[in-house]
From Swiss-Prot:
SUPFAM superfamilies: TPR-like. It comes from Cuscuta obtusiflora. It is found in: Plastid membrane. The lineage of its organism: Eukaryota, Viridiplantae, Streptophyta, Embryophyta, Tracheophyta. PROSITE patterns: TPR, TPR_REGION. Essential for the assembly of the photosystem I (PSI) complex. May act as a chaperone-like factor to guide the assembly of the PSI subunits. The gene is ycf3. It is a peripheral membrane protein. NCBIfam families: PRK02603.1. This is Photosystem I assembly protein Ycf3. GO terms for biological process: photosynthesis. TPR repeats lie at residues 35-68, 72-105, 120-153.
Amino acid sequence: MPISQKNQNFIDRTFSIIANILLRIIPTTSGEKEAFAYYINGMSAQSEGNYAEALQNYYQAMHLEMDPYDRSYILYNIGIIHTSNGEHSKALEYYCRAIERNPFLPQAFNNMAVICHYRGEQAIQQGDSEIAEAWFDQAAEYWKQARTLTPDNYIEAQNWLTITWRSK
């Protein structure tokens, strides 16, 4: 097993242990604890590439979790899985739902921008420059929002915004 994979497995195991300890000691309702357990199980399955299992756990967590902030991270992770599966429309839907509950998720804005940029590139390959420009404009808006939330991140996005004259 490569060293990076061993390190990731160690980090995942450490996170799971700490999460289980916190789950026992933090005063929360049984529903909140159960939702968190499903969320952790979803993250574990996702990190192992078991996306179907991860989605099942995330959907269970969504059913139990009432806090909008916590729900935003569940929705965000569901979006990541749909992105990984090439289901970009579904991914955009889940990222939007995450942002509705927590507008301070720069990574969701970034992921939405990446999908829009990809769709713009696809439109160019299909010879539809008008549609491509619309997708690129949408990508620019999402990247601007991500950069507003975390100005020191997404440097490549800032470079793209600058060279395409979309930074303002």
